[in-house]
Amino acid sequence: MNYTSFILAFQLCAILGSSTYYCQAAFFKEIENLKEYFNASNPDVGDGGPLFLDILKNWKEDSDKKIIQSQIVSFYFKLFENLKDNQVIQKSMDTIKEDLFVKFFNSSTSKLEDFQKLIQIPVNDLKVQRKAISELIKVMNDLSPKANLRKRKRSQNPFRGRRALQ
């Protein structure tokens, strides 16, 4: 690597690092704004123990943890939806929703849209209940491990073991 390439690579790393730091700083600032607005630093908030943290600790596998995280993210989206008309904290909520979008949905708009469709489905609607029950078998089959997947088989060479004996 020549000197010019090294300088360009260094500048790129510095820019990316500082922008990441700036984004994280803005994210934490907006969380602090929400904490202040909701008076979430008050000692009585801890009464009854944590809301999500103990549950998250119980799940170690990444795939299992994703299930719990999806429920928690769903909660936050519902919370932000209920507060969407509050102009005092709108910027903070938008910043945090954007960070959730990047971290949880890998910046995939289609994943976010599907997720939002799911959390908007009304559970008390009879038509929705009927459709859900109608689709239950397919959903359960989709959840089950795929037992009939073709597994790669080793070739059965009849001369394979004989060479080792000679």
From Swiss-Prot:
Family of this protein: Belongs to the type II (or gamma) interferon family.
InterPro entries named among the record's database cross-references: 4_helix_cytokine-like_core, Interferon_gamma
Q: Give the main localization category.
A: secreted
Any signal peptide, and if so, which residues?
Answer: 1-23
Q: What keywords would UniProt list here?
A: Antiviral defense, Cytokine, Glycoprotein, Growth regulation, Pyrrolidone carboxylic acid, Secreted, Signal
Q: Pfam families per the record?
A: IFN-gamma
Cellular component (GO) terms are: extracellular space
Which residues carry the post-translational modification Pyrrolidone carboxylic acid, per the record?
A: Q24
| Annotated Basic residues bias | 148-166
List the subcellular locations. Secreted
Query: Which residues pair up as cystines?
Result: none
* Glycosylation positions in this chain: N39, N106
Summary of the tissues where the protein is detected: Released primarily from activated T lymphocytes.
The role this protein plays is: Type II interferon produced by immune cells such as T-cells and NK cells that plays crucial roles in antimicrobial, antiviral, and antitumor responses by activating effector immune cells and enhancing antigen presentation. Primarily signals through the JAK-STAT pathway after interaction with its receptor IFNGR1 to affect gene regulation. Upon IFNG binding, IFNGR1 intracellular domain opens out to allow association of downstream signaling components JAK2, JAK1 and STAT1, leading to STAT1 activation, nuclear translocation and transcription of IFNG-regulated genes.
Domain of life, per the record? Eukaryota
Q: Which SUPFAM superfamilies match?
A: 4-helical cytokines
GO biological process terms, semicolon-separated: adaptive immune response; astrocyte activation; cell surface receptor signaling pathway via STAT; defense response to virus; extrinsic apoptotic signaling pathway; Fc-gamma receptor signaling pathway involved in phagocytosis; humoral immune response; macrophage activation involved in immune response
UniProt protein name: Interferon gamma
A GO MF term: type II interferon receptor binding
Q: Organism source for this protein?
A: Equus caballus (Horse)
Where does the record place the region Disordered? Answer: 147-166
